């Protein structure tokens, strides 16, 4: 399994949203993994440009974090954990 991490400073966050699902976009994997279970690593999107995805495919919601340089989509297998992460970033 691929192992990736990302460090985001609160001061770099321009926007954070809680999404019901991953946007319907053409995400092209640059480096990382894409299986039926997860999307993880570096991707390029026609709408968002350079992206990092840390997404479990059948788990919702999804957090979208926009910084000046990139967009990060992430979630956890447990929706309560994802909501908790969103609240800690959003507040």
Task: Walk through the language-model features, giving the residues of each.
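Terminal and domain-flanking low-complexity segments
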Residues: 22, 56-91
């Amino acid at each position: 399994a691929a192992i990736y991490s990302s460090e985001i400073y609160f001061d770099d966050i321009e926007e954070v949203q809680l999404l019901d699902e991953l946007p319907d976009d053409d995400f092209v994997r640059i480096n990382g993994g894409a299986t039926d279970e997860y999307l993880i690593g570096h991707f390029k999107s026609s709408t968002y440009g350079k992206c990092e995805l840390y997404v479990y495919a059948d788990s919702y919601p999804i957090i979208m974090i926009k910084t000046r340089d990139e967009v990060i989509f992430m979630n956890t297998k447990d929706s309560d954990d994802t909501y908790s992460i969103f609240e800690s970033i959003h507040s």
